[in-house]
């Protein structure tokens, strides 16, 4: 099975960036612990000040199962609390591999 990715493109709420970055390692650790099949999380800051949150899963099935668990993971909710309403969420698998 090819690895699967969730990629979220967003801004951070005004005035929340510093707190988000300081809380992020602990929040990521909680998410990793509670969502089976999650291989990696990377936060990428783009030149325009927006962020890509890239989650790498062992499979599409693991990513789909996580959707059901996401609401039960307090750390995931806290991460989303730093974001405004408008996010772009993309999903897909590794091509050619």
Task: Locate each region found by the language model.
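An amphipathic, aromatic/His-enriched active-site/gating alpha helix that lines ligand/cofactor pockets
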Residues: 26, 30-39, 56-90
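Active-site-flanking beta-strand signature of metal-NTP-handling nucleotidyl enzymes
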Residues: 4-11, 52
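Amphipathic, hydrophobic secondary-structure cores in small proteins
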Residues: 40, 51-52
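Short, low-order "capping/linker" segments at domain edges
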Residues: 91-97
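Short, surface-exposed ligand-recognition loops at beta-strand->loop->(often short) alpha-helix junctions
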Residues: 11-22
């Amino acid at each position: 099975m090819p690895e699967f990715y969730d990629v979220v493109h967003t801004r951070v709420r005004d005035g929340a960036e510093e707190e988000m970055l300081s809380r992020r390692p602990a929040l990521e650790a909680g998410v990793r612990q509670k969502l089976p099949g999650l291989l990696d999380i990377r936060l990428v800051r783009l030149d325009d000040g927006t962020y890509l949150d890239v989650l790498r899963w062992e499979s599409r099935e693991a990513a789909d199962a996580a959707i059901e668990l996401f609401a039960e993971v307090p750390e995931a909710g806290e991460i989303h609390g730093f974001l405004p309403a408008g996010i772009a969420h993309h999903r897909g698998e590794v091509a050619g591999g």
